[in-house]
């Protein structure tokens, strides 16, 4: 991956959350883009990585949805006087990256005890589910952005997606009064190329030669005693036949003058 593509991929993480499709729509679109490559058994970088994220997101998303549904169901059995655990006692995404997965539960349980030692068991389970659901959603958001990048590189080409991310970032960072009303789209970048190719196919066989067309040569005329004669059609006239000179005598009727030697 070149420097520009690597920078564009890093900028994907800074794009707004609502820019990307929802998980269900994203996975469906990615599968549609990957299906021809799966049938052809193509081994490409973007195909392999996008396939990995499709499988990961599908499994992770179903697990996260199940955890969220269980957490919502537990709210009904939590004592109404129970105070929710504050955010300061919940493991964040950055902290979870430093904690081993096996120690994640015990670390969060210790924080709950520090907040309230006799915290109800149902509320504890609900708190754990809240933490794990949030961590999964943040991990899914990162995977969702990476999946969008890789399957769009298959659809449009890596160079086109890189150019599009650069334009979109420029548009987002420009103050509103100095930028266009609508954000750039990836289709608008490829449209001029498609139009040019279509026009080239339509005019095939009738293409005009390059350069300027030769001008038609104007026929110059000379006036000889009121008559117009074309220089290009007739034989070049002798100096005695120029305009204003008398016509030469006819050689057939001309009589030779006697020579003084005779």
Swiss-Prot record:
Alphabetized GO MF terms:
DNA binding; RNA binding; structural molecule activity
Q: Which residues carry this modification: Phosphoserine?
A: 232, 245
Instruction: Give me the Gene Ontology terms describing cellular component.
Output: host cell; host cell cytoplasm; T=4 icosahedral viral capsid
Gene Ontology process terms (BP): microtubule-dependent intracellular transport of viral material towards nucleus; symbiont entry into host cell; viral penetration into host nucleus
Residue ranges annotated as compositionally biased, kind Basic residues, are: 205-236
Family matches, as InterPro entries:
Hepatitis_core (IPR002006), Viral_capsid_core_dom_sf_HBV (IPR036459)
Signal peptide positions on this chain: none
UniProt short sequence motif Bipartite nuclear localization signal, positions renumbered to this chain? 215-233
UniProt name for this protein: Capsid protein
Q: What residue spans carry the region label Disordered?
A: 183-262
Q: Where is the composition biased (Polar residues)?
A: 251-262
Note the subunit structure. Answer: Homodimerizes, then multimerizes.
Keyword Manganese present in the record's keywords: the answer is no
Described by its record, this protein's role is as follows: Self assembles to form an icosahedral capsid. Most capsid appear to be large particles with an icosahedral symmetry of T=4 and consist of 240 copies of capsid protein, though a fraction forms smaller T=3 particles consisting of 180 capsid proteins. Entering capsid are transported along microtubules to the nucleus. Phosphorylation of the capsid is thought to induce exposure of nuclear localization signal in the C-terminal portion of the capsid protein that allows binding to the nuclear pore complex via the importin (karyopherin-) alpha and beta.
**Lineage top rank: taxon:** Viruses
Family assignment from sequence similarity: Belongs to the avihepadnavirus core antigen family.
Q: Keywords of this protein's UniProt record, alphabetized?
A: Capsid protein, Cytoplasmic inwards viral transport, DNA-binding, Host cytoplasm, Host-virus interaction, Microtubular inwards viral transport, Phosphoprotein, RNA-binding, T=4 icosahedral capsid protein, Viral penetration into host nucleus, Virion, Virus entry into host cell
Which residue ranges does the record annotate as region RNA binding?
254-260
